[in-house]
Amino acid sequence: ASWAEAVFPAGGVQVGVGELLNPKEEAVLVATIAEWEAKTSGEIVIHIAKKLSSKDGMKDAYFWFEKLGITKTKNRNGVLLFIAARDHFVAILGDVGIHSKVEPDFWNQKIHLLIEAFKSNDKLIGLCRTVESIGAVLAQHFPLESNESNPNELDNALSKSHEGH
């Protein structure tokens, strides 16, 4: 899996899982995931943990990457966006299928854009733009043929937990 990690600045208000997005914002984000997944065989999953379970945020991200079944997609082209809200930690993990198609800096760019949005308190805009960007690269490398079925291999609803795992 490919990954990028960053800790977004702690200068803002500490937030819990339910406080990161309100229900309407969450619905917009889930619809954005579905919209982009309709264009590709790739899968985009977002997991929001209230806090990390240890000091190693990547360990938590990898735990959810496996637990949510992202490594079990047909084309190994799933992507996890992992957020630990109270610890201000963000990671993106791409499975081997998509990792082999993009430059490692791609993930770092997405993390940077998301962190800038979080710093500006534009969480929904940042998350939607990140999903759109990931969706676009998935559609570029894993496009659907006109007659190809596209089962939703992984749930589009946001995954949430109290701790990283």
Model-predicted regions and their roles:
Residues 1-77, 85-165:
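A structural boundary signal for the start of the first folded domain, especially the loop/turn
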Residues 81:
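Short basic (Lys/Arg) and small-residue
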